[in-house]
């Protein structure tokens, strides 16, 4: 069960945060791409309640090797295995937005460091899903997740200076089903292009980056929101 929350104080909220804290009322049975990537189901594990038996059965626990964003890895573990997941729109918590000087506040504006931490999160998810062969069965979904978590923001915020992030991604994907041509041919063209660029450690040109971002935004959010994001990116807005 995953519920909603309010940013606290309310004026500290921003578009992305307000959206992800506002799930709709819906239930999913079994594995669902929509639950993982289309709904406002992530991040923030404190708004998700799980049965103890479920967690014990699948040996799901927090990965203590991750110092930043461990809730992303935990939620990918539970949503990837859950037989039934319900999202409710009720806003049951007030979430204090990052305090000045906190880890989350520090990371928010250190783009490369934050994205390298996101690569560590992705590596943990990949290892966890490998336990039950979920990485083989859903390699194309994990490629989408890589773009969502790392690659889109790498080209949006770092542009042609994303080499260190791409190098870290290439290392994580070495030998993985996610980086295989068999998986990438099943992906949307924008997803496959971003993953291939990371594997080759070759940042696209500025024009190609803008085109990739727009195509990916259409894929994940629809044409109208993609146009809004494109305008926001051109204006240099970070929180879109």
Predicted regions mapped to residue ranges:
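Secondary-structure edge/capping motif, primarily at the C-terminal ends of alpha-helices
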Residues: 129-133, 156-161
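C-terminal, non-catalytic tails of nucleotide-sugar-dependent glycosyltransferases
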Residues: 116-141
């Amino acid at each position: 069960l995953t519920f909603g929350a309010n940013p606290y104080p309310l004026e500290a909220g921003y578009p992305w945060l307000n959206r992800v804290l506002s799930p709709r009322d819906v239930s999913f049975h079994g594995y669902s791409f929509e639950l993982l990537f289309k709904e406002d189901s992530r991040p923030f594990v404190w708004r998700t309640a799980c049965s103890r038996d479920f967690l014990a059965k699948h040996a799901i626990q927090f990965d203590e090797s991750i110092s930043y964003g461990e809730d992303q890895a935990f939620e990918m573990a539970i949503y990837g295995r859950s037989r039934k997941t319900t999202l409710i729109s009720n806003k049951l918590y007030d979430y204090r937005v990052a305090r000045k000087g906190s880890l989350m506040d520090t990371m928010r504006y250190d783009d490369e460091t934050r994205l390298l931490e996101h690569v560590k999160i992705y590596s943990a998810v990949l290892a966890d899903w490998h336990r039950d062969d979920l990485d083989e069965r859903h390699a194309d979904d994990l490629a989408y997740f890589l773009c969502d978590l790392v690659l889109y923001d790498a080209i949006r915020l770092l542009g042609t200076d994303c080499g260190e992030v791409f190098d870290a991604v290439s290392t994580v994907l070495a030998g993985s089903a996610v980086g295989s041509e068999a998986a990438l041919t099943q992906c949307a063209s924008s997803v496959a292009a971003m993953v291939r660029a990371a594997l080759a450690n070759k940042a696209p040109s500025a024009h190609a980056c803008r085109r990739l971002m727009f195509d990916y935004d259409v894929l994940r959010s629809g044409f109208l929101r993609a146009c809004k994001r494109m305008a926001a990116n051109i204006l240099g807005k970070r929180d879109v």
